[in-house]
């Protein structure tokens, strides 16, 4: 619409003459800049004014055909407009959990002394997630969706409330795919979000004292969503919006208030000392003594032969590894001399100290073994057979890793490293996750998982543990996997000059002193006998590196912070429900004692969108002459809602959590049988091409395969049945025009 159309406004009452009165714009109250006077043009009329014709104006020329058509859809019999108003804890973070994704840990029950939540959040909104928020009494529905199996999504209006002291950044996407990749969590870093093209900065009341206490913004439906009615059951799990946010510190972005330097320090195991990192019994035995558990061959290399031998010579330097404050009590029990490097470094005093320490170690190990058998009597196969991985005397014991050295110039099995986040360019950095059973420290494309590189460490560590857990699909990675790092921007550099692919194992002061990350000073016996570096012990280092980064909230200044987000989702429910009950005469109603009014607010009856489908409710066409048809009764009797009353416990992941990259569960099962058919066909062709002599040589193997063939066929049949059901359902939806864009799901 052109801007000058507003001048031709119709006045009431309608005038008799044809021309409308021209309304000129009012004079501005404020001073405005005037246009420069142009060249004088004569206003003499050069032509005769044409007289307008009465009636409808006629235009000459041939009418062209319309290029596009607007396809309309009939509305259902009943349409109800619903507003879903509620509040969401967008970010809840305790000190020590800055690196975590809050949505992933929102339903965690943390142990005593452990922080809760996370500083970043990455959520995906869908109708099922909104219903789960309703079950937690966090939102209110203005209209009920009961017996209405159709829906339309209109949009959502958000209201981001300003925190008194914490600023935060919000960004969202309406374009599919709504999935997380290896770069999704680290892209939530405040530095990268401020550099992104589209973002919303919600300033705190301390940063911006004036203004409204909230920031409002409206989000339209997804790009690939059609403006039509969908079945609620099919649309319940369809993502409609992906949002991510993080708290930031714009007032002191580069250096925390009250700190002297942005540099931090942590520890790294020396690859020359810890040549084996596996926790398997055979590997542990070989690394400890240089002898295989099933062999009599002995190697000259071994951890205890290098770090803590039973005897030394006058020229050896092995005593320096154990010259710590923890060995002082054993030295004084064995000798009456003062504890210094001259006395401890002599072969006689060192040997007597080792004998005292060895006796204490044997006695203590037997006590630990009995305690483990008492606590876990059924786990006899997992009873420790040696002390090599125990917390008190193992490879990673505080007797060897303690930072309380008498002198920093003595030999140590670790390296103290300093890191400056302002000097990290990112090029050459590399991190990955290895299973604790893996022996080597070098990166392997087949065995190593979740490799990221060429970004600063404070960005790579942001949400990395949550991404590894989501990518691997295991809930026990904190104890079964460890972090490997290569970084040339530390002092000294975490780069092996002989092997550029060899990584370093990082850990903090808590693990070096032999303490638990939580529940300190207590250590469970299951952790005590399996003490080695993993994500649970390395989380402290990741937290320190993340907290020192630019624009990051400093948990040293505040213990916790939380962000609240308000939302107003707009939906339309539709359907053809049964007619309401007949109207009765009020005077004929019986009387009874009036009950006391309740104290709780009355809420609407809201049905689960995932179960609200055309087969689970009655419609108007299900009645004939006031009675339900046999087909409708049979359909409803097949559906049982008894399972809804039994709670299966906490869900595996929150409903707002964004799923990882890849196909959905139903699509994955649908396409699995096609790959199974292709693999079986390829194997049959390869068997037909095999020569006769080769078949006779492998006759025994074929017999074993024949025995396993019925079990494999039954498994393939189950996969085929599940896949065909999904495919046929998609075909029927496509023919009826009820399909949803696969990129949205």
UniProtKB/Swiss-Prot annotation:
It comes from the Viruses. Residues 44-64, 580-602, 638-662, 678-699 are annotated as: Disordered. Belongs to the anelloviridae capsid protein family. This is Capsid protein. Residues 681-692 have a biased composition (Acidic residues). Coiled coil: none annotated. Keywords: Capsid protein, T=1 icosahedral capsid protein, Virion. InterPro entries: TTvirus_Unk. One of its GO terms (cellular component) is T=1 icosahedral viral capsid. Self assemble to form an icosahedral capsid. It is found in: Virion. Its main location: virion.
